[in-house]
Amino acid sequence: MVVNKTTAVLYLIALSLSGFIHTFLRAEERGIYDDVFTADELHHYRINERGGRTGSLAVSGALLSSPCTLVSNEVPLSLRPENHSASRGAPLMLRLAGCGDGGALQPGKRGVAMTVSGSLVTGPGSGSALLPDRKLSGCDHLVIHDGDTFLLCRPDRRQEEMLAAWRKRATQEGEYSDARSNPAMLRLSIKYE
């Protein structure tokens, strides 16, 4: 059987086109897409509810933006010794906003919605008036009760005495005027789990 040259060329073109079309239609399976994590609790919660990503969420490294912010830059410092143990001082209660909706995420549940560890640290510079290692105190877990969010930090007695002396000196010298130039101001450091 003799095949015409034109027929053979058309057959090869059709075979090549079908191979290219098949490769083109299956190209999506070969594509690699980055799975970008967004630091947003509600976004992750919705993905889990729709059956997308499930399991534990592990985040390493520094977050570019924190989901929590302080409600106020000023924290009342209660240095009353009553009802406190000999080793631990009065708790510093820090009110936070933007950490989630509390009861809206877990209806009917109360308790810890997100756990963190953190510390209050002094500002930059070597002339720190508080502690040479820059760490002031450990902070307890972050607790969200129906949107009311707070973080408790408990300084020990030595740290509490240093805070009282610093507060007295700052009040007398008027150091509250420029917080950025004062190396003894406290800053909050939170690590998310």
UniProtKB/Swiss-Prot annotation:
Signal found in the keyword field: yes
One GO CC term, this protein: periplasmic space
Coiled coil: none
Keyword annotations from UniProtKB, A to Z: Chaperone, Periplasm, Signal
Compartment(s) where it occurs, according to its Swiss-Prot or TrEMBL record: Periplasm
Pfam family, one: PapJ
Signal sequence interval, chain numbering: 1-27
Statement: the UniProt record of this protein carries the keyword Kinase: no
Superkingdom in the source lineage: Bacteria
Function in brief: This protein maintains pilus integrity and thus is an important participant in pilus assembly. It may function as molecular chaperone directly or indirectly in the correct assembly of PapA subunits.
Protein name, per record: Protein PrsJ
Taxonomic lineage from the root: Bacteria, Pseudomonadati, Pseudomonadota, Gammaproteobacteria, Enterobacterales
